[in-house]
């Protein structure tokens, strides 16, 4: 009985941070306002090498929310309501000529998901998630028509998560695997990853690893200056630090980078945020 109670308590604690095999409890929720930034003058080319590009920056302000409709069924929304993509001015030393910079701002591609708990209230919990990616962003914008706040394709992803708590230690691990069906001649993707987290009362550090592998079965053009491209691949570890201010409110920060990739910026991705638990 004590073990079951501990498992329930640690699962409720982990649920509030989203992701993993735990659905939200009925009428429970997790809502987060985040600011994300990535800027780079380096790019992972299609062959995996790192090449120089004109400096590009992407700023994303977003809302992420999870709400438990039942003890097994959770609704999830990711809405980047303000995305700004910029391209630096280029100045040629020999001629003195310049190419002006460029900027684009709009909303971004939005994800709507349903998660269902297949196995709950056990040391190992398993859930399945169906995600719909709505192409609300701009795939070709700015005066240069090369800036983006989205990829312009409607995707559907099916993902399975499994999580395990190491009773009596406040440690958990999670792993997932998913298939992402992309439209508009974009290649489909296989995605998988893992994370390990500690629930140290108010301080919750989480280490994540995400991997995206293209199936190379689409012929859409590959972007050469951002993250919204066909045949994007990467292996990316991320460290996330969460701090509980009280029972409901908390703050978080994270930093991640791709140590291998294709068709994606070759620089760290930074994020800060504040969250509310119901």
Segments (PLM) and residue ranges:
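Transmembrane beta-strands of outer-membrane beta-barrel pores
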Residues: 35-41, 79-85, 118, 132-138, ...
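Outer membrane beta-barrel transmembrane domains
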Residues: 195-278
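Hydrophobic, lipid-facing positions within transmembrane beta-strands of outer-membrane proteins
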Residues: 29, 59-63, 108-112, 154-160, ...
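Detector for outer-membrane/organellar transmembrane beta-barrel domains
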Residues: 28-29, 147-224
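Residues on the lipid-exposed face of transmembrane beta-strands in outer-membrane beta-barrel proteins
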Residues: 33, 63-67, 77, 112-116, ...
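Outer-membrane pore/translocation modules
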Residues: 86-180, 228-229
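Repeated loop/turn-to-beta-strand initiation elements of outer-membrane beta-barrel proteins
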Residues: 72-77, 122-126, 169-173, 202-207, ...
